[in-house]
């Protein structure tokens, strides 16, 4: 037994096996990206910052059905509906999302019958105060206007699987 230990230490078996393993990984392609300068791929089902969408004519899509508010497990969505219009439709007077409470589960997006509320492609929305994470209707509509092209493309790509 002692002779075996002497042979191992003289031949540096552990060192050589560790060195071989390190060299194997040293020459493989890198698995990480240089984040601020390179962006990783985000699939069409990526769930990022929330947005309210509009129809091509500029009218907001939300019909104040409150399904998203009812299905939200975190109770992060608050909606107030206005009175019915002459054409029988309703629109929201207040649409708030508390992004601190939101768990980004996507259930609001799945429940919406008109694809009004979506989780967009943006994941870089750090803020300095908690109040900035209380999104009102105007902020959500601005997000929708900003990301509409990419949101529409993601919905079109994902449509066969819905």
UniProtKB/Swiss-Prot annotation:
Its EC number is 7.1.1.-. InterPro entries: 4Fe4S_Fe-S-bd (IPR017896), 4Fe4S_Fe_S_CS (IPR017900), NADH_quinone_OxRdtase_chainI (IPR010226). It is a peripheral membrane protein. It catalyses: a quinone + NADH + 5 H(+)(in) = a quinol + NAD(+) + 4 H(+)(out). It is an enzyme of class 7 (translocase). It comes from the Bacteria. Keywords: 4Fe-4S, Cell inner membrane, Cell membrane, Iron, Iron-sulfur, Membrane, Metal-binding, NAD, Quinone, Repeat, Translocase, Ubiquinone. Gene3D superfamilies: 3.30.70.3270. GO terms for biological process: aerobic respiration. [4Fe-4S] cluster 1 binds at residues 62, 65, 68, 112. The keyword Iron applies. [4Fe-4S] cluster 2 binds at residues 72, 102, 105, 108. Its main location: membrane. It is found in: Cell inner membrane. HAMAP family: NDH1_NuoI. Belongs to the complex I 23 kDa subunit family. NDH-1 is composed of 14 different subunits. Subunits NuoA, H, J, K, L, M, N constitute the membrane sector of the complex. This is NADH-quinone oxidoreductase subunit I.
């Amino acid at each position: 037994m002692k002779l075996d230990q002497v042979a191992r230490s003289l031949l540096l078996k552990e060192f050589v096996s560790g060195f071989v393993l390190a060299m194997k990984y040293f020459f493989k392609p890198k698995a990480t990206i240089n984040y601020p300068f390179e962006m990783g791929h985000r699939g069409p089902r990526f769930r990022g910052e929330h947005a309210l969408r509009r129809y091509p004519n500029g009218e907001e899509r939300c019909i104040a059905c409150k399904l998203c508010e009812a299905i939200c497990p975190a109770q992060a969505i608050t909606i107030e509906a206005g009175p019915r219009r002459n054409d029988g439709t309703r629109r929201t007077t207040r649409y708030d999302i508390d992004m601190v409470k939101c768990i980004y589960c996507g259930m609001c997006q799945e429940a919406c019958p008109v694809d009004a509320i979506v989780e967009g492609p943006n994941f870089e929305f750090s803020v300095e105060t908690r109040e900035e994470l209380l999104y009102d209707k105007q902020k959500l509509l601005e997000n929708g206007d900003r990301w509409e092209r990419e949101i529409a493309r993601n919905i079109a790509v994902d449509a066969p699987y819905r």
